[in-house]
Each structure stands twice: as structure tokens, then as C-alpha cells.
Amino acid sequence: DAARINFKNKEQKKQLAHLLKLRIVDLDKKLKNKKRRAVRLKKYIAPDTKIKIMELKIEGISSNKVYKRFYPENGPVAHVVGFTGSDGKGQEGIERVMNKTLAGEKGRKINLIDNKYTDGKRTPRVIGQFQSIKLPKDGEDIKLTIDLRLQNEAYNALKKAVEKHEALSGSAVLLDAKTGEVLAMTNYPSFNPNGYNKAGDFIRNRVVTDVFEPGSTMKPISIAASLEKNIVNKNTLIDTGKGAYKYEGKLIHDTKAHGVIAVKDVIKVSSNIGSAKISEKISSINLATMYKKFGYGKKTGINFPGEVSGILRKHTKWRKIDHSRVSYGYGMNSTLIQSAQAYTVFANKGELKPISLIKGKDEKISKRVLSPKITKDILTMLESVTDNDGGTAPKARVYGYRVAGKTGTSWKINPITKEYFKDKYIGSFIGLGPVSNPKFVMEIMIDDPLADKGYSGGTLAGPVFSKVMTKAFEWYSVDADGLELEEIKNKKEVYADKRKL
């Protein structure tokens, strides 16, 4: 109350300004108009600060208790949970999607009041309840599918990779391959939802809002389309030449010459030329149809704010070179969550799993996309990608387990010239395991690393996959199925014997 404010001395005013983190000149401005009966000196203060202010015993100062969300798990889960605004309404993340469920409903009642006031406050005195119109309803609890252990593990591994390679950012998503539940979804850099006004561009959940050309992670799908139509088989030989192939006046490059290789090795060595030559044999409508079956060009249905569908142009608008480039993941774009969901097909004998972020939501039905036989062939090819002998992602290997996956390395597009940068890349890896009975699917993307420190998907994202999967297999007690199986069994037996002693 500006009219009643009365400082005993200058020191008292100085102490108040200090506690409110205001300059004295700004405090004076707020209190200048003595006709204003209610002046807000500070919107939010901590409870201990309020106590110190009230201990000053300055006449005319009062406070109101305000309940505000506090997020103890901030950085790693900030993009998933989101935050509420000053009005208590959800602004981002699950807070926004489930705001109505979390908030509950206010009640309404009619009271009898008189025109007297109590304790000097401008609040009418209630002398009796007349009628209750609507009872209040408490908000409901929401349980997410997120496993905080894996969320933190993924965040820390991602942070390490981004910092090591001096990249702009990184994102990761981990799915339960059998249920489609999102076990981890994180980005780095992140932000603190308790101070979201300082988040800037990093406030977006880039797993669902940002698109990029997926690159070579599309090769297993385009090759699966050709296998399904019996255009080629896994042993069909493809001449990839000396690492450069001119098609429709454009050069298609491989990182090195691979010569004549079988279809199954096109994925292992990630040959753009091999993928392009295989795609020449399949119609655009069949290739586009297969991509759509895998979920590209539409939202996943995760129901998260800002999710985009990505771009998969109509096949009727593809030129021959567009058809070729789409086979190895250029000329289209997708989100991380789309691609991760797509690879649930390879983990489930050809069925695409619907994904979810909230426990207890209505279960959706899986969709048949590939035959079990073709899926098995592709899964074998994906496992070869992690081979030490010629695979593009040996760094994704997990001790004691057979894992499979595909690397992706794509150039970034200059938003001004619409041309590709020659020194800016996006590196990604989509992996699943264990191969004998896939339990997890995970995709990692590292954006704009320092090229001198390595920019391929296998180098950037492979180690993140390996680190997180090692913990996931351990925490979920997944049986080992790798070549080191006997060694692991022996170690467990030795450990058990020591415990007996």
C-alpha cells in the first residue's frame, strides 16, 4: 500500500531494495504515486526472502502466498516435461499437452456476504454459504514412460559427444522396441524450466520439432522395397565402380571405391551408388509407398507440441535424379522420432509399433509393413554395419551383445543460398539390439560437429549408442547373445563364487 509505506530510516529502505534485488531509484518510482493502494514490488520471491522482508517491519508491506511449479529434474528432462507460465498453465511439453488433466477444475459456490471488511483488507466478509453450484475437481497424476536412469544416461552421453566434437547440438530418443514406449528423449544443450525465459532457441524439443535429411539411414528401407518386389535378392551383385557414378547429369559419390558388391554389402559399407543403382529397378510409386508405410511424411501420433510431419514429396513430382537421391535419404526430411519409430519394423519381424510417452494411454495396433523373411534379411545386413571388419559403425558395438544399426551422414543446407554447405554435417545412427530378440531401438543425431574432429554418423553417434545400450541391457537384465557370451558367463560364475566365499 503506497499510501501507508513508512520507512523508519534510509537503511531500512536500502535493506528492502537489496532483498528485492531492486535499485533504490527503481523502488522509489514504484512508491511515488501515493494514491495507488496496491503496488507490486516484486512478482515472485523465495519464502526465506519474504521472511527477511517481514522482519524489517515496514508498515504497509504485505505478501500473498503463490504456488508455483518447481522442476527438480531440469536439464535432462526439460524438453519432455516442459513448463507452466506465470498463470500456471502449461506452455510446453507434457505440461501443455496434459494441462487440463493436470490442472483439474475449479468449483463454484454462492456465499452470503456483508459490506464490512476484516483485518483492514479489501475483502468482503463471508457470513454464510448459500448454495454450492459446482464442486472442485482435483487434477490427475500423469505417469510418463520415461526411465529416468536411461534419460540421464542418454543426456550425459549426448553432452559428452557434443562437447568432444564441438558440435552445435545433439538429440537422442530411445524406444522400447516391443511396446513403442519412449524410454528416453533428450537434447543437448538443454535449459532449466525454472528459468525458461533464458532458454532461447534451445527451448524446442528437437526430437519432434526439427527435421533433417536422414541420409543413409534410409538405405535399408529403400533396399527392403526392392527385396519385397523381388527386383533383387540379398546376393545380387551391384557394380559400384570406382566411387563416382554419373546419373542424369549428376555425380553420385561414395566415400571410397567398393567395386562389385552384393546387395547385402551395400548397407554394410553404406554405398550411395549401390543404393541408387538398386533403386533404378523399382518404380517411384512403390518406393514412395514403402516410405509411407514406415511412417515418413506424417506425424507419429505421439501427440507432442510442435511435432512436424517432415517432407516426403509426391512421387509424381520426382525426377529420375530425385528418385535416386531419395533412395539414400536426400531430397526428403524427417524428425528423429519418425526414424526411430520406423526402425521398430526391423525389431519386430516387419511390424511398425505405435509409440507412446504416457503410461496407460489406449493401446494402438501394430501395422504389418514387411514380411518376416525380408525383415530378417535386412536385420542381418544391419548387424554387419557394426562389424569391425568393414562396417561403418564398429564404435556402436556393445560388449557381449549383438547389435545392429545404420549410420547416416548428410550435408547441411545453407538457408540463404539453398545449397549444401561443404563443411557442415549432420551425423546420426539408428541402432537396435540385441539382434537375437531386439528390446531397444535408439537414434542419436549430432548437428554441425567440427569437421576436423570427425563427422560421420558412426564416429559421432556410435559411441553414444554403445554407452547407453550397455546400461540399458544391464538395467533391464537383457540376456547376452554376443560372441563374448562364454566369457561373460565365466565372469558371472567367478563373481558368484567370490560372493559365496
What do the PLM-derived regions correspond to, one by one?
Residues 366, 462-501:
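Short, gly/Ser/Thr-rich active-site loops of penicillin-recognizing serine hydrolases
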Residues 1-5, 87, 184-190:
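Short beta->alpha transition motifs characteristic of CBS
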